[in-house]
Amino acid sequence: MKVSRPRPPKRTHVVDYSIPILPRQVDSPVFVIASVRSGSTLLRMLLNSHSRIRAPHELHLRTIGVQLTPDFSEQSMQELGMDKVELEHVLWDRILELELERSGKEIIVDKTPGNVFVWERLHYAWPKAKFLFLLRHPEGVVSSLQNRKGNTSTREALETNALKYFKPMEEARRTLDGLTLRYEELTAEPERITRDVCAYLGVAWEPEMLDYSKHDQGRFVPNLGDRSDTIKSGRIQPARTFDNTDALSPELAEYAKAWGYS
């Protein structure tokens, strides 16, 4: 019988940065800052279809850590100018580098939703990182959560889940330099939006990006991205649109307003 493992908590990481960062092998990775059910899998497949951009499945870097033995490895690493936090950054950096080497591409993108909880750490670890903020109407996010296969959560619980992502995502969007996108616009005008993304990343736009089914996107694996029939269709399909925010809680309605949906 398969053993169910607890998922990492959905909260912002508080990290003590006491040691300067080391040089990175990947100088300017790209991180998508987005909630669950926001269309980030479609975005990553479009980007991964570019000849110079590697956008793999969700990497979940924040849950990849190291353990140092007190008085031995801890002291040894400190003599080399590294603590646990910086060692983890070195490991994450190497993972990105290996994936770039394997793909033969130049730019790597990670779209893990959990990035919203470590955006400060990602910015600290990679001062030259680039950020894509992907928004979706809050009702679209909640409705998508409701429609998931096997969903048993109440509407209230799903809204609470969405808020856990929205709060740090909006904080990151207001703090960091980056490019803000809307899922609804990505599906309605994919060429225009992907052109904007390519311009931000400093690469020429390629029409092949829009036909993502013709490129190797990897396997559809649980917990590593969307596996719905919509994404598997290989076609960009219009997102659901919502005329108002009447069904949302007051707190979610505030995000809809802040993001230009009302």
Each PLM stretch: what is its role?
Residues 33-47:
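Glycine-rich phosphate-binding P-loop
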Residues 26, 37, 187-188:
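Short, solvent-exposed loop/helix junctions and linker helices
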Residues 28-30, 40, 127-128:
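Short hydrophobic "helix-edge" motifs at membrane interfaces and signal-peptide entry regions
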Residues 61, 67-70, 102-208, 219-234:
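PAPS-dependent sulfotransferase catalytic domain
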Residues 1-30, 170, 199-262:
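PAPS-dependent sulfotransferases, especially Golgi type II membrane carbohydrate sulfotransferases
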Residues 21-28, 45-121, 125, 230-258:
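PAPS-dependent sulfation machinery
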Residues 31-34, 184-186:
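Short, well-ordered beta-strand elements within core beta-sheets of diverse protein domains
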